[in-house]
Design a protein with these regions (language model features):
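Mid-core helix/loop region of P-loop NTP-binding domains shared across ATPases and GTPases
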Residues: 6-8, 14-19, 58, 73-80, ...
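Residue-level preference for the first positions of well-ordered beta-strands
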Residues: 20-24, 63, 124
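Switch/connector loops and helix/strand junctions flanking conserved nucleotide-binding motifs
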Residues: 33-34, 73-75, 165-169
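Post-Walker A helix-loop "phosphate-sensing" segment adjacent to the P-loop in P-loop NTPases
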Residues: 43-55, 87-90
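Conserved catalytic segments around the Walker B and adjacent sensor/switch elements
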Residues: 48-69
Length: 189
């Protein structure tokens, strides 16, 4: 089912009953988490170009890898997602990064990200070095705001980081259950 506007096609599906998919990969620094991920992702195209019956082309982003900025908040993280969308699409200008930057609050940035996830039917967003994020702050600017994006869009998320990230990300059991499977990479080093 496609809904068209003047410049984009929005892919829609029946994801109302879909459960959140996700995975958390935690391990020692330098144990090969990011390298393993690179090898895995090299087997998949990052973008698939679909063609409609009228020969209109529209991209679907299979996955994004977002390296979390050091000592940053969720506003910076959402801007990084916009930047990675531009890179995946091969944009020479930071179109989607600027779109996210123009949103004033973290909540508005999250809403822009939701629209972009739906517009490009993004399958999975991988957050590497997630321990670098500042998880303190108000509810709107915490990991819970990211989970709200996940709940709205049903995009799968993968969090990759060191053991420090686990206690920051999951202050309670309810939060850890919402992100899916947990893999302790130390067992494979």
């Amino acid at each position: 089912n496609d809904t068209e506007d003047s410049t984009h096609v929005r892919l829609e599906g029946n994801h109302g009953a879909a459960s959140n998919a996700g995975i958390t990969l935690i391990g020692y620094s330098g144990c090969g988490k990011s390298a393993s991920l690179e090898i895995l992702l090299s087997n998949y195209p990052q973008v698939i170009i679909h063609k409609s019956e009228s020969f209109q082309r529209f991209p679907q982003i299979v996955y994004l890898v977002v390296v979390c900025p050091a000592n940053s908040n969720f506003s910076a993280l959402y801007i990084s997602i916009g930047e990675e969308i531009d890179k995946a699409l091969g944009n020479l200008e930071p179109v989607y990064e600027q779109m996210v930057k123009r949103a004033r609050t973290v909540g508005e940035k999250a809403n822009v990200i939701c629209k972009l996830i739906e517009m490009f039917a993004i399958g999975c967003i991988i957050f590497d070095e997630i321990q670098l994020l500042d998880f303190s702050g108000q509810k709107e600017s915490t990991y819970e705001s990211l989970l709200t994006v996940v709940n709205k869009t049903k995009v799968a998320i993968m969090a990759v980081g060191t053991e420090d990230a686990y206690s920051k990300m999951f202050p309670n059991l309810r939060m850890s259950r919402r992100t899916g499977a947990f893999i302790e990479a130390n067992a494979y080093c």
